[in-house]
Swiss-Prot record:
Cofactor binding, note field: Binds 2 manganese ions per subunit.
Gene name linked to the record: pepA
Positions contributing to Mn(2+) 2 binding: 269, 274, 292, 353
Main localization of the protein described in the UniProt heading: cytoplasm
Gene source species: Photobacterium profundum (strain SS9)
Localization per record: Cytoplasm
Family: Belongs to the peptidase M17 family.
Role according to the record: Presumably involved in the processing and regular turnover of intracellular proteins. Catalyzes the removal of unsubstituted N-terminal amino acids from various peptides.
Gene3D superfamilies: Leucine Aminopeptidase, subunit E, domain 1, Zn peptidases
Annotated protein name in UniProt: Probable cytosol aminopeptidase
A biological process from GO: proteolysis
Amino acid sequence: MEFSVKSGSPEKQRSACIVVGVFEPRRLSPIAEQLDKISDGYISSLLRRGDLEGKPGQMLLLHHVPNVLSERVLLVGCGKERELDERQYKQIIKKTISTLNETGSMEAVCFLTELHVKGRDTYWKVRQAVETTKDSLYTFNQFKSNKPETRRPLRKLVFNVPTRRELSLGERAITHGLAVASGVKASKDLGNMPPNVANPAYLASQARRLADDFDTVTTKIIGEQEMKELGMTSYLAVGQGSKNEAMMSVIEYKGSADPDAKPIVLIGKGLTFDSGGISIKPSAQMDEMKYDMCGAASVFGAMKSLAQLNLPINVVGVIAGCENMPGGNAYRPGDIITTMSGKTVEVLNTDAEGRLVLCDALTYVERFDPDCVVDVATLTGACVVALGHHISGLLGNHNPLAHELINASEQSGDRAWRLPMSDEYQDQISSPFADMANLGSPGAGTITAGCFLSRFTKKYNWAHLDIAGTAWVGGKEKGSTGRPVPLLVQFLLNRAGLENVE
């Protein structure tokens, strides 16, 4: 799929298809008005006849419009002009791409990027169009024996920008959008893999491949023997019921000209399958517990995007791969575990395992003297109750870092919402026998999980993203979303000083 930007009049575009917008009720966008004028009112006459109202997602494909060089013109319903926001814009792009693909338009010039979207500039509109296009065309069918193929798939998309001065802005948006889309695809592919393939060793192999593909990336794999030597007893306890060895992949990206620049650290929970262990989960939808490694998948995707963008910063990505299974050697409710930090944990529920893996990873990364640490995890069902499936949960111990991440979430459209983590909640994870319990008393489950993790982050600025509600979509159309790769990449772009300014 090839993307480019240009600035020109619609009637002069020689393409398989031109894409322009129509607002409710039957109001032509400025670009559509130009086409209507050059075609002697051909388009407006169709609208008066009632062929298209302009409601969001409505499509009307016109052939051989008078005096227009392109073979076809696709009219796209955009709803009411004043109500066109970022969510509706992305939905319109998605429906447009689907229509172009279905109708055999192998190339198109898209003028939707010239529409006014509340609070968004040309860079954002082009970048979101690229990301949405790539996401719309994503398929995961490598395990199907019969793979459906589009007869004449969309291969080239040109986005028009209002002035030539904005061409460089559009080109940068395409570069950034393609990198984000590449990371999202990598994350989705990992998440959608079946757990009999995507075990901790598979995650490690993908981390090694990333180092093979980019000179700026090195990867170290830490297996169970080294974990024992490091004292990562909590991490090991979670995986000891599985025949698949726990493996932690440490991916280092060095892009800063200053070799001593402190790195940003990203940590991803990588439970390649979470049965719940001895505290076993209900069988309904247990298949979706292959998605319990989506935190690790998103860190992997963000590291891939980062390497493609060649950003001038240092970043360490940690993929905490593990499998939580019941068995004769599995850890039990009632066990007391000594973590790598020396703190002890009473296990109340073996299905609250993500925090037991993450706490040792959080201690491990102290050796990098990080500028900040962000962990990403499908950690709590309570986050789904609190925020649903649209917004990720955010907690942390450093207000400026939390604000940076919220800002990146707004810029990217991959939203997060900060939850409180005041001292009162810490009492909910107290234990009569150990320093803490791995499960809080009823209420505020996402916050008490954050409180647990916070006890292992005293030496650096830290934030936690709970993506339990946003990492995948369940049900018949189940699949990984690739989130929060866009948020993470935007955060890294901002840290590199490459946030967009028109």
